[in-house]
Amino acid sequence: MVPGTSSLTQDLVRAINGEYSAIACYAKLAEKAPNQEIRKQILEIRQDEVRHYHIFSQIFSEITGTKPNPQITEECPTAYRVALKFAFQDEQHTVDFYLDVAEKTQDPFIKEQFKRAAADEQNHAVWFLWFLRV
């Protein structure tokens, strides 16, 4: 195992589980959206999370030689507005986490993937904040 991959592997497991949880949550959130415009945007955000999940899973498999075993680590609130606030806060925390991972890794590809995902997550947070005002 390459030095530093144990920490990276743990970070990838956390990222994979977070994306997996968000995918499930945003599907439920989209069903509760008050209109088609918001529903469509939430589903677009969900697609970004699916993409992140696949990228992080691929990196995990390349490093460990195994497939990840994703788990839902955070339950999605059932009330629409509570779930929006939860999603906003989660996206903000995820931005910080992904930027930390990008800073720690020496691998340019992995660094770039986490930076791109962090930028997406920041964009998602802005959308969820906007949805809270509608």
Model-based region annotation:
Residues 1-134:
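Non-heme di-metal
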